[in-house]
Structure formats: structure tokens, C-alpha cells
Amino acid sequence: MRRGSVLPAWGALATVLLRARALLAQAETAPTPAAEAQPFDWEWLKGQARELARQPFTPLGEDRPPQLQALTWDQYNAIRFRPDHALWVGTDLAFQIQFFHLGIFYRHAVQIYQVDDGQARRIAYDPAMFDYGPNKFDPPLPPDLGFAGFRVHFHEDFRQDVAVFEGASYFRATDRDSQYGMSCRGLAVDTGLSRPEEFPVFTRFWLVRPRPSDTVLTVYALLEGESATGAYRFGVAPGGITVMDVDALVIARKPIERIGLAPLTSMYQFGENDPIPDSSTTVGPGPSPWTSRWRR
């Protein structure tokens, strides 16, 4: 992933532009809000982020109905996306998209759009997309529930993940051996201070329908938080090592004491031994294919 730098500048609204450059600027007038089959491009999304920065922050509500709030980890994991319902399945495109269900600690629904020929249309949640396993919901789940996020699959093996966008502003990717690297966040705010850190959230995504010859998937995202808003553009290029090229415009709503751009995160079990991050350890028989991976 490419990281940018922050250059100090005057103004109450700080605008950070990643991909080897950054600047601070005041918010500008934005285009009208998104609607069904509305024209979409990068400039429009940046305008949305600027307009949101001019408005008071509205905390995100609880999108999980009680039935999903009560799920255990095993019950939630029993909810599986049906691959035959993937976005772009049955086409000659190199990518497919599968969606994640709300539940357990995924409490905020994200809006996901497909962009085709510059027109954005929202992808509707449909319970038929999912196999709920032994789970039975009474009353039935709402028909407009929404998604928790999505994962990207590539034509070399549609069964394997390439990248995942799910939870707050988290995203991550795999290599050709399906080993996930460290997770990344779109933005970190006030980490390591005496007060709790702030977690800005990707609330909307736009997936650009690729051409049959495309081997890079373009994903856009809108970030919302109490202290900042942002517009993000991801170029996801699968391969031996998956490469993500990221452009981001981040606008501060108020002064931020500590800001982290493209922060990397991992985890390890605390104990007497030296910490071994779960994102970088693999176990295999040598040069032959991997047989197992230590995750946690």
C-alpha cells in the first residue's frame, strides 16, 4: 500500500490527500445526495465528504434487529453467502463480489453500489443471498437489512478471498497462498491517549464494474466520523502479492490531537513467549504448498 504525508497548512478543516501527496483545505459545496441511478465519479465523492464535514456529526444507529444481536459467534459463522448469488457471477469478468451479513459485533449496515458506465445503483439486500444454516429467526429479518461489508474474489480461484472490507474502516488482503496480511484502517483518530480512541466508519461503498480485460478492481468508499470525513479510492490488484493503490481525501470536522493515516493492525496472544503476530506466521513443509497456517 502506498502512504502519503501530511503537510501543515492553515484552516480549521484539514484535508489530507494520500498517494504521495496531501494538503489541507476548507470544505466546499458538494453535489446533491446520491439517488437511484445517479451519475457517480471521484469528484462527486470528494464533494460528499466535504459537505458532510460542514455538518454536525450524527452518530450511527443500531442496524441489527434483536435476533441478530443475540447471535453467538458460532451462530453468526453459520450464516454463509451463497456463491451463486455473487455480484458478476456468470459473466466473463475477472472479479466477483460476495457480501457479509450483519450480526454479532457487525452492527452498522453499509450501503453498497455498483457503478456501471458512470451510473451508480444501490445493491439491495436479499435474504436469498445467504444460507442461514440452523439459524431460525422469529420474527423474520427485515427485507431491507443491508450488509456488513464485502469480499473480493478473482478468476484464478473464485473460492479464495482476495480482499475484505468489513467493520469500521478496516480492510485487508491476501496473497496467492490465501495468507492474510496485516489489517489496515482508513483512518485512526486519537490512538494511544488517555481517552478511548475514535473509530471512523466506512458507511458507503461503490464497486466499479470492471471490463472483461480488467485485472484491477476499483472500489470507492465514504468515511464518516465524529472528527473527520473522507473519500477513498482503492485499486485492488490481485497477484502473488495483492497490491492496493489508495487515494484518500480526509477532512477534519474539528482539531485532531493524533491522526493515523493507513494504520496497520495485527494481534497476538499475550503470554510469556515473544509476541507472534497472527498476520505473518505460516507453517509449511518447506518449498511445497502450505499445509497449515497459525492464525491466533
Describe the role of every protein-language-model region:
Residues G225-R233:
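Low-complexity, acidic Ser/Thr/Pro/Gly-rich terminal tails and inter-domain linkers that flank the onset
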Residues L17-T58:
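C-terminal segment of N-terminal export signals and the immediately downstream linker at the start
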Residues M1-A25:
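N-terminal export signals
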Residues H101-G103, G235-I241:
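Short, solvent-exposed beta-strand/turn "edge" segments of beta-rich domains on protein surfaces
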Residues P134-D214, L222-G225, D247-R296:
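Beta-strand/loop-rich accessory regions of lumenal/periplasmic or secreted enzymes
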Residues A124-D126, Y232, R258-A262:
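Short, solvent-exposed loop/turn and secondary-structure capping segments
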Residues A53-L193:
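Solvent-exposed N-terminal domain segments of exported/luminal and surface proteins
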